[in-house]
Amino acid sequence: MINMTETKQLKLILIGDVNVGKTSILHRLIFSKFTEEYKSTIGADFLSKTFYQNDIITHIQLWDTAGQEKYWCLTSAFWRTSDAVILVFDISNESSFRNLNFWYKQFKSKSINPDGTEKQLPILLLANKSDSLTRAVDQSEINQWCTDHKVNLYYEVSAKSSINIKESILKLVEVIIEQDKDSDNEQFNDSPDEETSSITLLGTSKKHDNTNPNKPSTSSPSSCFNCK
């Protein structure tokens, strides 16, 4: 009997202030390494990674974008082909948290379907540098921001210490796939009264990427809280 494995292609976009660690997060996920050397991203670039989980092969494009407004050049057409957005801030830098409102408005204004309706992208919020001795943002403020902006996925991560990097991305991929299934079921049943299930994420875990049960392959370079 032939085992048919499903294949998914996903495009994820990282946005946030300069120097919050977007590039470091990608390098930790893709190459399992961290460097102290800082180089600002200009425009946008991407890295690719393939994961296998739950009998699904998922090819992911992770887009690293500039954290400076003058380099913000992502068009509506770019966002139409996106499957999710990853908002990143530095938990030791309060201004990077305050500026989440700017980045949220930016991608919301660009995420427009061809028919003019707003594209409802899943959002993952990452508080990077969770291993920092200085915490500048109170947890209650983060929870309130998540509630105000209807963000259900939030992780505290560290690219330097490899905390929750892989776990957070895999959870986002899981949510995207589940939403796709729900959408397909709604279209198949064609029932306006059908109830859709909500996903509740609870708990914090600080596992390191070296515990790798899925053995994901790299293709080409180019503390979860329930926010209610």
From Swiss-Prot:
Keywords: GTP-binding, Lipoprotein, Nucleotide-binding, Prenylation. A motif (Effector region) lies at residues 38-46. Residues 211-228 have a biased composition (Low complexity). It holds the Pfam family Ras. GTP binds at residues 16-23, 64-68, 128-131. Residues 185-196 have a biased composition (Acidic residues). InterPro entries: P-loop_NTPase, Small_GTP-bd, Small_GTPase. Residues 183-228 are annotated as: Disordered. Belongs to the small GTPase superfamily. Rab family. One of its GO terms (biological process) is vesicle-mediated transport. This is Ras-related protein Rab-32D. It comes from the Eukaryota. GO terms for molecular function: GTP binding; GTPase activity. A lipid is attached at residue 224 (S-geranylgeranyl cysteine). It comes from Dictyostelium discoideum (Social amoeba).
